[in-house]
């Protein structure tokens, strides 16, 4: 992947706890049941193209890789999770020492992707794969949506110039930045 330089947006921030609480409770369950080292394989796919267009465009790899490279539970994260009362100390210690050992395969950025076909595969300890799920879904779902729309607009323009005005309608500054980056 190529490096990113951006002064507007800190794309290297730690998104480890930007997850559904469910992912944490499932991971804690895996640890409690002795599945910490059990290897799992998760495939990400989509069921249908929302606009009936037949295909989507793969996008989001760079953001996903940057986020995965930054995964680390801080003491502040651990203390917050402890305060919920939902997790035992064994799980919190696991998170404190968390290191990703997964293999991740994905369709190349910019390629057409189709319903019911894997676009990202994650293989590794089940507990680690589970902790990646929300990050994977939120990153690729948004980026593929925007890339697909941009692809369709550019194809319809048939070589005429196209201008991007997405920031004013984007769902937050991240969406505006990453949409414009496509």
Where are these regions (language model features)?
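Buried, small/hydrophobic-residue-enriched core segments of structured protein domains
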Residues: 6-39, 48-50, 86, 92-101, ...
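An N-terminal, globular interaction/scaffold subdomain
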Residues: 69-71, 106-109, 113
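N-terminal, Lys/Arg-enriched amphipathic/low-complexity engagement segments
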Residues: 39-97
């Amino acid at each position: 992947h190529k490096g990113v330089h951006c002064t507007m947006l800190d794309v290297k921030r730690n998104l480890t706890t930007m997850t559904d609480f469910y992912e944490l409770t499932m991971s804690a369950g895996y640890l409690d049941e002795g599945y910490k080292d059990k290897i799992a394989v998760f495939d990400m796919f989509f069921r249908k193209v929302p606009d009936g267009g037949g295909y989507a465009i793969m996008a989001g790899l760079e953001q996903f890789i940057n986020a995965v490279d930054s995964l680390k539970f801080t003491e502040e994260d651990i203390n917050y999770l402890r305060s919920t009362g939902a997790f035992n100390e064994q799980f919190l210690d696991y998170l404190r020492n968390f290191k990703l050992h997964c293999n991740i395969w994905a369709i190349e950025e910019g390629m057409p992707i189709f319903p019911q076909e894997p676009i990202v595969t994650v293989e590794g300890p089940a507990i680690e794969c589970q902790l990646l799920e929300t990050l994977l879904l939120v990153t690729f779902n948004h980026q593929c949506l925007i890339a697909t729309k941009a692809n369709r607009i550019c194809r319809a323009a048939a070589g005429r110039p196209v201008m991007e005005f997405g920031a004013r309608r984007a769902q937050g500054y991240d969406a505006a930045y990453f949409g414009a980056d496509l």
